[in-house]
Amino acid sequence: MNAMMETSELPAVFDGVKLAAVAAVLYVIVRCLNLKSPTAPPDLYFQDSGLSRFLLKSCPLLTKEYIPPLIWGKSGHIQTALYGKMGRVRSPHPYGHRKFITMSDGATSTFDLFEPLAEHCVGDDITMVICPGIANHSEKQYIRTFVDYAQKNGYRCAVLNHLGALPNIELTSPRMFTYGCTWEFGAMVNYIKKTYPLTQLVVVGFSLGGNIVCKYLGETQANQEKVLCCVSVCQGYSALRAQETFMQWDQCRRFYNFLMADNMKKIILSHRQALFGDHVKKPQSLEDTDLSRLYTATSLMQIDDNVMRKFHGYNSLKEYYEEESCMRYLHRIYVPLMLVNAADDPLVHESLLAIPKSLSEKRENVMFVLPLHGGHLGFFEGSVLFPEPLTWMDKLVVEYANAICQWERNKSQCSDTELVEADLE
């Protein structure tokens, strides 16, 4: 009898275990996918001014909820992973022309030029000069998607291909792109200004590209001539401050660091003959490079210390990060500047966001936009599971650029009216 009672109780025990297991799995899913996180408009940091009030009226995306895909879109890790593996879905293939520029040290810089597919909303000739993320180029899907959308909104687009990033373009000097070198971007901008003397510029940088474009604008006042505005998306602002956070396992940053370092190693080693070959006349700083340390490197900091800083002769990693970061130059930018980050970006530690917040509190030309979700260069939109081809980020950058163009047009018309009234008097 006791045996029969024990046997009858077993299914109830198993049912309880199953229920607990299901509950545990659901809890993990809810936590990992961040399903309880609300959707909301992005947090905005700015000074009250005529420009900021105009932007709030002209850019609905600044005040509307950003709604990511329901099931996975609130996870910064999944957004980042999808950007990293897919780039974008159903990405278009814009048609452009590749341009080559020989730099003073013999390096061959390339960029791709895409003509507008429609008239711009203000009727002017406007060129977006675009700097992609680390080791990226014009053929990356997120760049193709953004360029296609910008073209359809009347923008000419020039996209820098980072030195050494294109697999089919050989290096012609012992140097490749670094965290903050602005030489190639500056050469592209000068080409555009010379070739299209009537054009005005909208400067756009993604991730590492955001650091480069902000540093470029702040290096000298002349670099801001003909520039209407600048947009930086998902950059970290200070490599010196970021290096410690990149070695932490919080938000899996150490894992992302390893993956990016592995990709950088592959790129560097694919150019080993051009960079380190015996026949190459290279700077003294590269002579003592120990490639065995490169092979065993597991972080970007190790690669930067062993290889990248030596391209420009920096004596230490600290000096390299201090000099190459845009943080020292942000206060010298006087054109309208929009800085965009996602609160759940696993690559950019929240402590780094104090930099754009502080800047926006001091400068009327700066607006810092911080949505809850989006990951690192993700910002996918969609109803439940499948993302849309166009992202919230693509729309926001073009919407902001359109608003600035209209703002400048309004200022110009007001000035013309004042001149006419003065003449009549």
Curated annotation (Swiss-Prot):
- Residues crossing the lipid bilayer are 10-30
Output the GO biological process annotations, alphabetical, semicolon-separated. acylglycerol catabolic process; medium-chain fatty acid biosynthetic process; medium-chain fatty acid catabolic process; negative regulation of cell migration; response to progesterone; response to wounding; sperm capacitation; steroid hormone receptor signaling pathway
Q: What is its EC number?
A: 3.1.1.23, 3.1.1.6, 3.1.1.79
Q: Does the keyword Transmembrane helix apply?
A: yes
Recount the known activity regulation: Acylglycerol lipase activity is activated upon binding to progesterone.
InterPro entries with a match to the protein in the record:
AB_hydrolase_1, AB_hydrolase_4_CS, AB_hydrolase_4_sf, AB_hydrolase_fold, ABHD4
What family is reported?
A: Belongs to the AB hydrolase superfamily. AB hydrolase 4 family.
Q: Name the chain's protein.
A: Monoacylglycerol lipase ABHD2
Source species of the chain:
Bos taurus
- The protein's gene is named ABHD2
